[in-house]
Regions:
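Nucleotide-sugar donor-binding/catalytic module of glycosyltransferases
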Residues: 2-237, 319-322
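C-terminal subregions of glycosyltransferases and related glycan-biosynthesis enzymes
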Residues: 193, 197, 203, 224-323
């Protein structure tokens, strides 16, 4: 599933290219599952890759494991960097800024998942069919596994097309599924470090769609997303998960997230397409408008979530000043 936007030509060059794909691995006290993840990267059917591991100050055996694999793979295939120690989103952004000229494609990677062997191959097959000057972002559904690697479910299957109007109010895929091209990397690397973002995956979806890129949502689960004590997201489709989202809305968390995202997007306004500037303005106006105008402006903006319950929640959030 994808949505085509008017292309934004982003000039880029890779004079320091070291591989077709740069895998951006963020680590922090991830020794328990890190070796399994690294083995799944090594087993990829696409082998033209390098790993850039950005460690955010681990105090367990994470760095020791990374150095063991560096000795095995060579320091020209596994690079180890010190992260900024400002949270996972900043760590990924730092890794991207550091490597943006060194590959044709980039893939975010968490420390505790397991990639399917064809994960990179699937993303590259889609991306390579499109112009390199267009920002491209591939993402997918996920299998959910427990701490022992047993299947426990799947992330939601979304059917509606990806777009900026959707991205403003919903993130449809985890960063651990994402692969993007150099044009998208150059674009995302313009994000100022001092600008807070909620998460690197939601931010990537917002910016690539907003600036005229293409996003493809693969219904095939390309990774096994591990759920454990430090990383529980749930299937996102159960009654419990819906109640959690309702509680967040009532507490104002959704509104706070929108505040952060809209402030960050304001720094990219000149890069947005004219149509997406219009959507952004209408959505912002809807959030500020008196009650009797809110729903009309929401409708005019065209923002939407992927499901009927999600869109009903969007209306409810608007009516109770939690948008």
């Amino acid at each position: 599933m994808e949505r085509q936007h008017s292309a934004l030509a982003m000039p880029f060059a890779s004079p320091n290219r070291t591989a077709r794909v740069a895998i951006l691995l963020s680590t922090y006290n991830g020794a328990t599952y890190l070796s399994e993840q690294l083995e799944s990267l090594i087993a990829q059917t696409e082998q033209d890759w390098v790993i850039h591991a950005s460690d955010d100050g681990s105090t367990d055996a994470t760095l020791e494991i990374l150095y063991q694999y560096q000795r095995r793979l060579g320091d020209d295939r596994l690079y180890i960097h010190a992260g900024p120690r400002q949270g996972f989103a900043a760590n990924f952004l730092s890794a991207l800024k550091r490597t943006k000229d060194q590959a044709d494609y980039f893939a975010f990677c968490d420390q505790d998942d397991l990639w399917e062997a064809d994960k990179l191959e699937r993303g590259l097959a889609w991306a390579s069919a499109h112009p390199t000057s267009t920002p491209l972002l591939y993402c997918s559904r996920t299998r959910l596994i427990d701490s022992t690697g047993q299947l426990i479910g799947f992330s939601p299957l979304f059917r509606r097309p990806p777009s900026f109007a959707n991205a403003l109010v919903q993130s449809i895929a985890g960063g651990n599924t994402m692969l993007f091209n150099a044009a998208a990397a150059q674009l995302l690397s313009l994000t100022p470090f001092q600008v807070p973002i909620i998460s690197h995956d939601w931010w990537s979806y917002i910016i690539v769609t907003g600036c005229g890129g293409r996003v493809h949502y693969d219904e095939y689960p390309a990774i096994n997303y591990r759920q454990h004590g430090n990383n529980l997201i749930g299937s996102n489709s159960s009654v419990r998960d819906r109640l959690v989202r309702l509680q967040r809305m009532l507490k104002g968390t959704f509104r706070q997230w929108n505040d952060v995202n809209l402030e960050a997007v304001s720094h990219f306004r000149q890069h947005l397409t004219h149509e997406n500037q219009r959507i952004l303005e209408l959505f912002g106006s809807a959030r500020r408008a008196p009650l009797y105008r809110k729903l009309s402006l929401i409708s005019q903006s065209g923002v939407y979530r992927q499901t009927l319950p999600g869109n009903l929640g969007l209306v409810a959030a608007s009516l109770i000043q939690r948008l």
